[in-house]
Structures are given as structure tokens and as C-alpha cells.
Amino acid sequence: GHDEDIDDLSPAGFDAHVDLARRTLERLSEVEPTDAIDEVTIAAMRERLGLQLETADAGWDRAALNNLASPVQGCRDIFDLMPTDTAEQWATIATRMGKVPAALEQLKVTLAESTDRGVVSSRRGVQACIDQCAEFTSPDGYYAGLLAGAKLSDGSPLPQEVAADLRTNVEAAAAAYRSLGEWLEERVLPHAPAADAAGRDRYALASRDFLGATVDLEETYQWGQEELARITADMEATAQRIRPGATVAEAIAHLKADPAYQLHGTDELKAWMQGKADEAIAMLHGTHFDIPEPAHRIECLIAPTHTGGIYYTGP
């Protein structure tokens, strides 16, 4: 029911998320679990929602700027999974696209408040967003490609009214992203710290976000250094097996030059990924895991942009 909408990125929107998390936690305190599933669910919700509130208290929930998972990408990535078969579906895309400019203006207000409080992402993270804004809106970027490839599933053109709305709103969204990039460069980048290191307090929050657990950071770093040394030694030994006397870089170059390990074009890459995914499901299902039917097919796709990296969306 919200396919035409975009999240509220204003300070009030972030406040609403925090308020919902706080009210949900209060209601959880009144819930009595009836079985082990309830116990696990309640514990997981308390951990996630509690961490959300801690992150909000530190101000980092509304200051995120990076190359992969921040509102700068979210306002564009949201269109990747929208169906594009029918005129009605394209009309929905056009309507949602028309809301991008307002969302990015809201984001500016939120980021300005965070910047004024001294809560700013690293310079490299801010610069990555600036670069992506330019890439999205370039002559061969995402928005130009979306307009050029807009057609129905049977290959026929969009109805004239839908096509006109789409063009108007895509051009407005592109203009909004250009404006955002310029604004970030002028308003946020000068205040962004040059160091990538986030600091212990922020790192502790982020590690809990990714791990779902609190770990001893010193012990974890020591383990990480040991693992890095082990992997480095393994890489060097493997390089010798591939080509005696070769460094790791030379062994990689040797493999890249071998036609047996080459893929040409996105179609070959997509087919290779799909084959590996299907093979993995076939090997694991019924032997190591009972994989539900909706997850039997992992659809491998090539994202319309070349920013960020590989990502997965649930079924």
C-alpha cells in the first residue's frame, strides 16, 4: 500500500522512528511469552530496538553518509525492485519518483542539524555520496538509463501520459540529486573528519548492529590480526602452487589472463552467478539445511548502477 511513497527523511521522520521503537519496547515489557519462539522473538526485538535507541541517542541514525547504505543510496535503490511490466507499474514508479525531490530536501535539513551538532560521517564517506550524486545524474547515468529503457514487458512503449509523467519526475529527481551533491560539498564536506576511524564508542554500537552481540573489541581485533596473518600466508602458498616463484599479485594476474577464468559482459556474469546460486541450493537443501520453497530460487541480477557492491534482498 506504500509503493508510491518514500520514507520521511526529515528530523521529524527520524523522531517518529525513535518514538515507535520506544513505544514498542514499552509494550514488550507487558508481553508474556507462550513458547520458546516467543521468548526468542521478544529477546531479539528488545536487542534490536534497544540498540536503535542507543544509536539515535548518539545521533548516528541521522548522520549516515557512505558509499553503500545511507539515505543517498536508499532514495535511488528503492526503485530497483519495483516491477516494470505494465503501464500501471510504470505509473507507480513515476509517482514515487516525483517524491524524491522532497525527500532529498528533508535529508538536507536532517544532515544540516547533525553537522551543526558535530556529528558528521568521514570525509571519504561524504565524498562517496557526492560522487554518486554526479554518477546518478550523468548523461549515461542511472536516470538517463531509466528513461531510455522504459518500456512494457512486451517491448512496446509506455502510454503517452505515463511516459510524460515519468520523464518529468525523473528529470526532477535527477535535478534534486545534482543539488544534493553540490549541497553536500558546500555544507557538509568541510566539516567531515579526514580520518576513517569511527572511534571506540561508535564502533561498539556498529559492531553490535552487525553482530547482534557485544564482543570484546581488543580480543576480536587480536583474533582478526591473527586471521589476517593466516590468510596472507595461505595466499602466498597458493600463489606458489599456481606459479612457482610468483607473488600473490602475479598469480592473480596469471589467472586473470587465462580464458578459463574469464567472463565477458554482464550477461555471462549473470549466468555464472545464477548457476553457482542454483548449485549451492541443490547441494545444501535436504543435506545441511531445510530451505523453504520461496528461497529455493535466488534470482541473480545486475544492478542498474555501478556504485556500492553486491547486496541481497529477502524473498
Report residues per predicted region.
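N-terminal maturation segment of proteins
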Residues: 1-315
